[in-house]
Curated annotation (Swiss-Prot):
Broad enzyme group: transferase
A GO CC term attached to the entry: cytosol
Protein name: Phosphoglycerate kinase
Catalytic activity: (2R)-3-phosphoglycerate + ATP = (2R)-3-phospho-glyceroyl phosphate + ADP
Keywords of the record: ATP-binding, Cytoplasm, Glycolysis, Kinase, Nucleotide-binding, Transferase
Domain of life the protein comes from: Bacteria
Gene (UniProt): pgk
MF (Gene Ontology): ADP binding; ATP binding; phosphoglycerate kinase activity
Family matches, as InterPro entries: Phosphoglycerate_kinase (IPR001576), Phosphoglycerate_kinase_CS (IPR015911), Phosphoglycerate_kinase_N (IPR015824), Phosphoglycerate_kinase_sf (IPR036043)
Subunit organization: Monomer.
Keyword Kinase recorded: yes
Lineage: Bacteria, Bacillati, Bacillota, Bacilli, Lactobacillales
Family: Belongs to the phosphoglycerate kinase family.
EC number, as in UniProt: 2.7.2.3
Binding, ATP: K214, G301, E332, G359, G360, D361, S362
């Protein structure tokens, strides 16, 4: 079912509540990476260009104490947003109460207000985690501040919080619209097409430490993918399931039987490393060597080897749809980053394919290589994109009104 989007709404003179994802890294008041702020700009600009009053809500980090509040204020984000929009942005150091209501009452068409971190509602109250546990009264209060609601936070779409599901539910109950922003719409389009209607050959690339994080994705994508390429720590659980020696490599002993059943179910669709970069310890400075698919007892696999890279490249060169989630090795250490970087290069070389990257390390690799402009879509949601690839319904999308 197609969702209502921000451009379907009449925004002139309307108070537009927007749930954005401004959960950016901040240290000592300095923003380390403003990508998520930049990603929200198309929706914010559309609203203010069409005479709407943009009232922005976001969480930032996990708030467990008053000390966290000092570190996790959205004030630096509001200041950065003002620079990016090249216009004043009002920051309100509260997200409930008289100061909030007065700031909104004083807004003119085209103004932007940022309310304080929604997770400040997770402490110092009788309910408990009002935001994270979706206190309906909080959702109703926030909904009362606006005329329409736009959810543009894909990063929290797999969570049912007061600031997404709570507001949308209260809005719809009051006969007001709840729409998707441009970022949410883009995520639905790219991930939805990949999961539901991919152009073949469709190749899924999965990495990262744990099989347990990706079980649902593998099960959902086995029937849809032509190939599933597996690297990273999770590959060693699969190699162990095939009877290979994995030395001291990271693996999940309790998932070996499951890996066996996934291999049986997938037939030859699952492609595992045929060689590895192995070291005596988990350190960039440790002696390391290239070994086959059996790893010596005193070593651990920390990256895919050059033959595996070639094998993966050979499969990828014909792909028309590629979804990549998770690194091929211990990417944070230069000696074990090459497999991940080579996969990134292979994706960038594809000319007529839809390429989608999700997950922090895969995204970091794309940035390090400078290939982001050559990738069709880089997802802004880690857990949310995994849940989507599993075929799960995401509360933050389900709560948006259908067209």
């Amino acid at each position: 079912m197609a969702k209502l989007i921000v451009s379907d709404l009449d925004l002139k003179g309307k108070k537009v509540l927007v749930r954005v994802d401004f959960n950016v890294p901040i240290k000592n008041g300095v923003i380390g990476d403003d990508n998520r702020i930049v990603a929200a700009l198309p929706t914010i600009k559309y609203i203010i260009d069409h005479g709407g009053k943009a009232i922005l809500l976001s969480h930032l980090g996990r708030v467990k104490s008053d000390a966290d509040k000092k570190e996790l204020s959205l004030r630096p984000v509001a200041e950065r947003l003002s620079e990016l929009l090249e216009k004043p942005v009002t920051f309100v150091p509260e997200n409930e109460g008289k100061e909030v209501e007065e700031a909104i009452d004083n807004m003119k068409d085209g103004d932007v207000v940022v309310l304080e971190n929604t997770r400040f509602q997770d402490i110092d109250n009788d309910f408990g985690k009002r935001e994270s546990k979706n206190d309906p009264k909080l959702g109703e209060y926030w909904a009362s501040l606006g005329d329409v609601f736009v959810n543009d936070a894909f990063g929290t779409a797999h969570r049912s919080h007061a600031s997404n599901v709570g507001i949308a539910t209260a809005m719809k109950k009051a006969g007001k619209p709840a729409a998707a922003g441009y970022l949410l719409e883009k995520e639905i389009k790219f991930l939805g097409d990949a999961v539901e209607n991919p152009v073949h050959p469709f190749v899924t690339i999965l990495g990262g430490a744990k099989v347990s994080d990706k079980i649902g994705v593998i099960e959902n994508l086995i029937p849809k993918s032509d190939h599933i390429l597996i690297g990273g720590g999770m590959a060693y659980t699969f190699l162990a399931a095939q009877g290979h020696k994995i030395g001291k490599s990271l693996f999940e002993a309790d998932k070996v039987e499951l890996a066996k059943s996934l291999l049986e179910k997938a037939g030859d669709k699952i492609v595992l490393p045929v060689d590895n970069v192995a070291a005596t310890e988990f350190s960039n400075d440790a002696p390391h060597e290239i070994v086959g698919d059996d790893i010596p007892d005193n070593e651990m696999g920390l990256d895919i080897g050059p033959k595996t890279v070639e094998k993966f490249r050979d499969i990828l060169k014909d792909a028309k749809t590629v979804v990549w989630n998770g690194p091929m090795g211990a990417f944070e250490m230069p000696n074990y980053a090459e497999g991940t970087l080579e996969v990134g290069r292979a994706l960038a070389d594809l000319k007529d394919a839809v390429t989608i990257i999700g997950g922090g390390d895969s995204t970091a690799a794309a940035k390090q290589l400078g290939i982001a402009p050559k990738i069709s879509h880089i997802s802004t949601g880690g857990g949310a994109s995994l849940n989507y690839l599993e075929g799960k319904e995401l509360p933050g999308i389900a709560c948006v009104s259908d067209k």
